[in-house]
Amino acid sequence: MAVIVAFVINSALNLLLGLLIAKMLGPADFGRFALATAGAVVLNTLLFEWLRLSATRFYSARVRDGEPWIRAGLDRAYGVIAVALVALAALCAGLGLAIDPSPESRLAITAATALTAVGIGLFDYHAALARARFVGGTYLKLVVWKNVFGLVLMAGTAWFFPQPVWVLLAGAAAQALAVVVMRAALHDRPGVFAPERSRQTLRLFAGYGLPLIAANAIYQLMPFINRGAIAAAADFSEAGYFALAADLGSRGFSTLGTALDLLLFQLAVRAEEHHGREAAEAQITRNIGVVVALLLPCAAGYWAVTPALQQLVVPEAFRGPFALYTALLIPGLFCLSIMNFALNPIFQIRRRTRPVIAAALLGCAINGIGLAVLPRLMGPAGIAVAQSLGLAAAAALLAGRALFGPDRLAMPWRDIGLSAAASLAMLVVLAPLRHLEPAVALTICVGLGVALYGAVVWVFDIAGLRLLVTERFGRRRPVAAE
């Protein structure tokens, strides 16, 4: 429960922080900031994500006590990569001071981007260690501290020094400070670094994580390339419009999806450990039903409340383009979430992850074709359509690999069909209400949408959610006295 609370807090505060920074920087500088942030995320994925995946999969409370050399090896690997990236940042900063000492220079922003990647990697790695040990309280505190430092440092920096490079550095500092504050709870007893054993383990970790990292890097490169394409085709203001819509949408989907994944994937891993591969794949089938049943209505509901959110929380300079880009990006964001949290676990359990890379490459290719064709037909909005088409193509390929062939998975078609029908019915009811007065529209759409979809879930027990709710919150029967 603490993990879910942490994700809710993180999502809400990230939304607030993104809006504050967008308002203080303005569309053009926010576009530069978003582009650099996307670059930092890509760097983090390429260099540090395998450590996070390995910690989540192979580190535990038992390993912490019985095999401390695993943590020692992971720490050393992070330290080596971080030092190299800091050295690169120092080189860029030094060249920037010699060539163009202004904070708007490309070298300055590149240096800040590298340091931001180090900060993101440091936080994500330690958060994964806390989750792997199932210490929810420690994880919750870590997230809270990160957001407190983020709000104070990043919002304060954007107010006093409204330039992307300083806000990026403030973000890196916020993530590092959260780890420093929680260092006692996250610390393990010193482990002996055993070179040969650690090398074997790191090879295992790399073999497990690299295919997933490659796919994630491709998916993160797509919006990075697309933001650059919009800036080149129009200007940085247009890139800022696109970035805000993409960032707010992706944060919502990824927060819910990641919270589900933390709970559901571990159930599949546990099923494999205790009952074998067949039981694990049966659990994956149930997980897919749950993920679709929760993400699909969220996608539909987000579209329904977009006009109200635009008027109530989006800075005035971004209004208009925000609603347009959001509507075009939602299908792609939904497809990406389905891949990450419903389809990828199939291949993770099987430890055959090449289809994940193939799907990502197809998505990138479709996105590239769209970039070449659609902007001439639709203007900058065509770039958002290209991104959604690329992600939809990737999801279709991955689903096809799961559904066909000798190892095809039995899909929960009943749950998927009922979720789709209920979401469509909800959209039909909410669509006429979208353009009411914003506060009224938001209140009615959220309340009515939850009530309608929740009623269908309850009546038909979609994905077993009714049973889960009654087991979790139902009244406990009194135990008879012996």
Which residues fall in each region the model found?
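Membrane-proximal transmembrane or re-entrant/amphipathic helices at the cytosolic face
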Residues: V428-E482
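Membrane-water interface segments that mark the loop-to-transmembrane alpha-helix transition
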Residues: M1-N14, A36, T45-L97, T110, ...
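Interfacial segments at transmembrane-helix termini and the short loops linking adjacent helices
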Residues: G96-A112, Y302-F334, I338
